[in-house]
Amino acid sequence: MRLAQRLLRSTAIWIDPMSFRPFTSESYAQNDRPEAWRDVLAAVGLQPVGGHGFFDGHATASHRHAAGVALTRMAAGAQSVGPLAQANEDLPIALMPVEDGMVLRSAGGHRIVPVGHLVLLPRGGDWSIVFQRDMRAIVLAVTSEALHGRLSGKPRLGEPRVISPSGFSDVFARLLDATARTLDSLSDAEWNSVAQSLVDLLLTLAHQLAASTSDAGSSATL
């Protein structure tokens, strides 16, 4: 029930289709800041986890939303985040640390993710991202609504995947970073066009990773 209320509240207050939404923790009373920050994370399919939570420190975020697309650039103190449990399975969440690295914790162990590397994260599962000093990240969340009925199939990732910026993934990472830096200056038409490009790139990258995982599994059984 609380999850449903949070999603409804974040949709009604934090997300306004195609408009730029700035967030600063100082706009809220101290007692309301943790819940307000939860709404920011929920907008891109995340929630606080573990012992590192957001309490009453300073946090900012820039957010923009289109049909089935949510992009947020956020800055806050040390904390851990994980997947927000949702009934529907959408495309993997794309997360990229900026200014400082982070630690990915999953069933495969712990892995340091350097600045500029991409992480594709399943919408569920036993994983978390730890920002040990400061949280500086760009997060892209895409739902099936953004596919506009295209029968391309939704790729399935069982585990988080870390991708170094090279070739196609570098193109995606650069567009993600450039878009996050200019969220407040794009017109609605420009934002809608760029958002659809991000959807297409994420879909292609996720399919490539899912296919490589499938091929590796098939080879292992031969």
Question: Where on the chain are the PLM-derived regions?
Answer:
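Glycine- and acidic-residue-biased ligand/ion/polar-headgroup-sensing regions
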Residues: 66-67, 75-80, 88-104
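Alpha-helical bundle regulatory/interaction domains
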Residues: 2-55, 103-222
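Sequence-level motif detector for i,i+2 pairs with an aromatic at +2
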Residues: 66-71, 89, 135, 201
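His/acidic/aromatic-lined binding-pocket segments of jelly-roll/cupin-type domains
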Residues: 62-63, 84-87, 91-96, 111, ...
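Short histidine-centered beta-strand/loop micro-motifs
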Residues: 81-88, 129-131
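A short glycine-rich, His/Asp/Glu-containing loop-to-beta-strand
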Residues: 37, 56-78
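Residues in well-ordered beta-strands of folded domains
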Residues: 70-72, 95, 130, 141
